[in-house]
């Protein structure tokens, strides 16, 4: 027994050992926590805890070695964060809640919003309508990933009581995370704020409304003004909206044709799935002409539009041409950025940047130094490049010049830029201008000494620049180099720029830029100048210059643009005449003068130097343009001054391009009723499925980009590439040169009669005996074989071949409309109504649905009326409306519109009426409008 007890004491059980290990582990954890809290790093505390239990010393020592390593690594981190914990660790509970919050995305309510809980019946559209906001805005406001919401979901909606009327989706928008820690100001108090942000800021998902993900990467719809070429009903202006799913056209309600015929005739909508081909052309040579053979088509058809220099690729290669299109657009942008470059690749400084520098009075320099500068400028005018540094100091002269430059160049930057270096050709002229400015800004006594040399230098430079261009072969450049003042004294205009169009367009540009100026005075100046001669212009200029006022309202200021560049930049003006809008690069730029002395010095020098030399060259070739402008001004002066401003139509001189949309079936009328929109595909079968629109040329690239992005397989595809030939008419058409193309068509669609004719090569007539009449069960009391045969031919294909079963007959079931409804309730197929009146006339209708009681019209476009009085006629759906079938307790109606019914029967199936209705455009089916029913049958197909 003793041995057994000793064994028990010596050998402990498994659970006892496990319990001791667990207890030792807990003691080690508490010891490490105490060591971390005190930061002493001593081991005595841990050993004291472990002394009572001597059996577990080895196990605890293993734990302690691991804890020492962990403690050393943690102490380094804790020492770094000791300073930070003063600001963040308030208590343990708050830290625990912070740890939980770090795992969640904290959403702050935006300004001007309130919370709304979605109900069972709420949808995103209904909530948006309730709070006067668009659904897309609501999705953006709540950062939703779908338009689907669930009951109980909390959404942010605009608050009507909030003072902020607009919702600002900024950094405080929903989705922007808010850190649960302290503010940024507390971060700045720390010795290392960046370290604090990196160390303690939780890892969170930041959703900002200004991020690139929120911005739409592609255009989701296009909206533009265009004109629709209708089929024989004129051309209507309207708005086209193109989306990835639909193409819509809404006519302008103010269009004369819309006022006359209504908007129902011109509103169109077409799903993108029904579009066969979309193409853009420069003309309408591809437009189909009615009753024209293929050989009559023009041979020089306009090629398909491609942006830039894109070659007309094959259809299988241009499925996704994004890369090349982007590269072409990039080249276009580079070309637009280099429009200030001339044909000979010499840079031209824009006017504002060159004239915006203010001439100042140089301090510390004498008159001799300025005259030396002027002499050196004459020496370097034709040769080496010069470096000029223009001053920015203000002066009285510069203030007036700045205002003129800013008004003439409204679209450019107003900042003044120092011109550090220019090219060789441009630098000479610029240096001469700067030197001339410095000389003119001298004191009066200094100016008198320099006037003679200024006159000589100006005359010499003007004569040299003008005579240098006399030898050129280009007349346009020659006339651009001529002096403007001399041409004005001779009452002559320079050559019209090729890029500016007609003289009318240049005058329109003048009036457009100077909208804030006195336009009446401008036009009076033009007219009086042409009548009284050049002396008027001299007097006007002298008075304006002597007064020191701004000379723009009078139209006297000579404002210059870049030059005769091939880039076609818009020309700024303000000259005495509308065509004087540019000079050659070699000429000195104009200077705004404030005194009559300065004006006379320059003016007399220019006039005397070039008046005799350039008289004939300016006068000969420009009289036509002057007379055109005179006539145009005389016509425009008769209208109010508001009408002188150019309209949008006048500004856009480029012709439109033409958009051709080919569809598989005619487009639906967007303003038609819902039922008509569903069944409109059955009507107007003879209408060609091709629609033409005139679109603005500036929106053509947008259209092309949109189609290539959303429907790349549609643009430019021809219908024949798909292997189908759209048959638009029911009868056969003669196809010119059908057999000239060997084996290009694998199959064709023909009528039943043509197939029968081809069965026998020697048959020249149709064998009508081969037609098998449908089986009628039971035999009809009203229809004979002749009636059945003719009706069977006109029935839709989906019911041909089925036996006819009698569903209702007045001879069997009695004369009651309710009985007819009851017998037709079990049917699930189209029905044929046959009526025989007291005049023994047989007529009726084919209905796509069984007759039933309904509170609205039903049926499809396959419904038709027929009569055998006196000959067999079928009246199909006209497409005007969708009043096919309407079943009521008191009557049964087929066709309607305008209070007239194609066929009407009373509740007793005894009295009836037939009128011409707009649904079928039918004749009266019976001999008289009102008739009495003798017998009636309803046949089903099953």
Curated annotation (Swiss-Prot):
Domain annotation LysM: ranges: 114-157
Compositionally skewed regions (Basic and acidic residues) per UniProt: 1-12, 369-381
CDD domains given in the database record: LysM
Coiled coil regions in record: 4-29
Annotated Polar residues bias: 25-38, 356-368
SMART domains cross-referenced by the UniProt entry: LysM, TLDc
Cellular compartments annotated: Nucleus
CC per GO annotation: nucleus
Top-level lineage group: Eukaryota
GO biological process per UniProt: negative regulation of cellular response to oxidative stress; positive regulation of transcription by RNA polymerase II; regulation of transcription by RNA polymerase II; response to oxidative stress
Modification Phosphoserine, positions: 89, 179, 183, 208-209, 211, 441, 500, 502
Alphabetical UniProt keywords: Acetylation, Activator, Coiled coil, Nucleus, Phosphoprotein, Transcription, Transcription regulation
Tissue-specificity statement: Highly expressed in brain. Weakly expressed in mammary gland, ovary, uterus, prostate, stomach, bladder, spinal cord and pancreas. Expressed in cancer cell line.
Compositional bias (Low complexity): 162-183
Family label: Belongs to the OXR1 family.
Entry function: Enhances the transcriptional activities of several nuclear receptors. Involved in the coactivation of different nuclear receptors, such as ESR1, THRB, PPARG and RARA.
Subunit structure: Interacts with ESR1, ESR2A, ESR2B, THRB, PPARG and RARA in a ligand-inducible manner. Interacts with the heterodimer AHR-ARNT.
Official protein name in the record: Nuclear receptor coactivator 7
């Amino acid at each position: 027994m003793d041995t057994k007890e000793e064994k028990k004491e010596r050998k402990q059980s498994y659970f006892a050992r496990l319990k001791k290990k667990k207890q030792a582990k807990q003691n080690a954890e508490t010891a490490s926590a105490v060591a971390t809290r005190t930061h002493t790093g001593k081991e005595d505390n841990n050993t004291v805890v472990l002394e009572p239990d001597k059996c577990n010393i080895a196990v605890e020592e293993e734990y302690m070695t691991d804890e020492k390593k962990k403690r050393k690594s943690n102490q380094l981190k804790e020492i770094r964060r000791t300073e930070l914990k003063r600001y963040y660790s308030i208590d343990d509970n708050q830290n625990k809640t912070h740890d939980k919050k770090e795992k969640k995305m904290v959403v702050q309510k935006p300004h001007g919003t309130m919370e709304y809980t979605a109900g069972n019946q709420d949808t995103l559209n209904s909530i948006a309508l309730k709070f006067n906001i668009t659904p897309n805005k609501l999705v953006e406001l709540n950062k939703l990933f779908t338009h689907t919401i669930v009951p109980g979901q909390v959404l942010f909606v605009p608050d009507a009581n909030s003072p902020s009327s607009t919702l600002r989706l900024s950094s405080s928008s929903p989705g922007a995370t808010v850190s649960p820690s302290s503010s940024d100001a507390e971060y700045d108090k720390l010795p290392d704020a960046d370290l604090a942000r990196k160390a303690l800021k939780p890892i969170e998902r930041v959703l900002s409304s200004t991020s690139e993900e929120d911005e739409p990467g592609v255009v989701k719809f296009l909206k533009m003004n265009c004109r629709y070429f209708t089929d024989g009903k004129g051309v209507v202006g309207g708005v086209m909206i193109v989306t990835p799913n639909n193409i819509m056209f809404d006519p302008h309600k103010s269009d004369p044709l819309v006022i006359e015929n209504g908007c129902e005739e011109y509103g169109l909508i077409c799903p993108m799935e029904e579009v066969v081909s979309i193409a853009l052309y420069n003309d309408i040579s591809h437009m189909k002409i009615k009753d024209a053979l293929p050989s009559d088509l023009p041979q020089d058809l306009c090629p398909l539009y491609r942006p830039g220099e894109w070659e007309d690729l094959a259809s299988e290669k241009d499925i996704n041409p994004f890369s090349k299109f982007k590269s072409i657009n990039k080249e276009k942008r580079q070309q637009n950025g280099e429009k200030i470059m001339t044909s000979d690749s010499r840079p031209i400084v824009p006017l504002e940047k060159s004239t915006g520098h203010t001439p100042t009075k140089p301090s510390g320099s004498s008159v001799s130094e300025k005259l030396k500068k002027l002499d050196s400028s004459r020496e370097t005018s034709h040769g080496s490049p010069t470096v000029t540094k223009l001053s920015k100091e203000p002066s009285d002269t510069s203030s007036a010049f700045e205002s003129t430059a800013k008004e003439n160049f409204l679209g450019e930057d107003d900042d003044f830029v120092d011109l550090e270096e220019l090219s060789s050709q441009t630098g000479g002229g610029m240096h001469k201008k700067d030197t001339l400015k410095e000389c003119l800004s001298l004191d009066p006594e200094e100016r008198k000494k320099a006037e003679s040399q200024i006159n000589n230098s100006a005359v010499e430079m003007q004569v040299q620049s003008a005579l240098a261009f006399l030898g050129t072969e280009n007349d346009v450049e020659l006339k651009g180099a001529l002096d403007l003042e001399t041409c004005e004294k001779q009452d002559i205009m320079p050559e019209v720029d090729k890029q500016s169009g007609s003289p009318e367009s240049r005058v329109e540009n003048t009036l457009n830029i100077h909208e804030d100026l006195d336009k009446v005075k401008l036009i009076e100046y033009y007219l009086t100048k042409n009548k009284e001669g050049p002396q008027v212009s001299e007097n006007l200029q002298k008075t304006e210059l002597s007064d020191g006022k701004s000379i723009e309202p009078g139209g006297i200021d000579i404002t210059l643009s870049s030059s005769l560049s091939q880039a076609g930049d818009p020309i700024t003006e303000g000259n005495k005449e509308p065509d004087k809008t540019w000079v050659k690069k070699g000429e000195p730029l104009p200077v705004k003068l404030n005194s009559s002395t300065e004006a006379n010095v320059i003016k007399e020098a220019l006039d005397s130097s070039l008046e005799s030399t350039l008289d004939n060259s300016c006068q000969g070739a420009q009289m036509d343009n002057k007379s055109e402008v005179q006539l145009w001004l005389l016509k425009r002066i008769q209208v109010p001054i508001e009408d002188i401003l150019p309209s949008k139509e006048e500004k856009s001189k480029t012709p439109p391009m033409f958009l051709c949309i080919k569809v598989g079936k005619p487009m639906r009328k967007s303003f038609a009723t819902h039922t008509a929109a569903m069944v409109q595909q059955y009507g107007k079968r003879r209408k060609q499925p091709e629609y033409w629109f005139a679109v603005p040329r500036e929106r053509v690239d947008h259209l092309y980009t949109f189609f290539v992005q959303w429907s790349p397989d549609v643009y430019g595809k021809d219908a024949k590439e798909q292997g189908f030939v759209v048959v638009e008419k029911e009868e056969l058409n003669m196809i010119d040169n059908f057999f000239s193309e060997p084996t290009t068509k694998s199959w064709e669609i023909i009528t039943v009669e043509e197939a029968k004719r081809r069965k026998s090569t020697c048959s020249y007539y149709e064998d009508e005996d081969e037609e098998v009449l449908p089986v009628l069960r039971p035999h009809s009391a009203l229809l004979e074989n002749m009636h059945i045969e003719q009706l069977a031919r006109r029935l839709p294909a989906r019911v041909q071949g089925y036996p006819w079963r009698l569903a209702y007959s007045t001879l069997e079931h009695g004369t009651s409309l309710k009985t007819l409804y009851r017998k037709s309730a079990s049917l699930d197929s189209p029905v044929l109504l046959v009526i025989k009146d007291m005049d023994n006339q047989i007529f009726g209708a084919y209905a796509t649905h069984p007759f039933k009681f309904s509170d609205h019209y039903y049926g499809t476009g396959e419904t038709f009326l027929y009569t055998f009085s006196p000959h067999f006629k079928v009246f199909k759906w006209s497409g005007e409306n969708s009043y096919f079938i309407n079943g009521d307790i008191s009557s049964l109606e087929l066709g309607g519109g305008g209070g007239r019914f194609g066929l009407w029967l009373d509740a007793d199936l005894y009295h009836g009426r037939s009128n011409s209705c707009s649904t079928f455009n039918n004749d009266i089916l019976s001999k008289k409008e009102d008739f009495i029913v003798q017998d009636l049958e309803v046949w089903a197909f099953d």
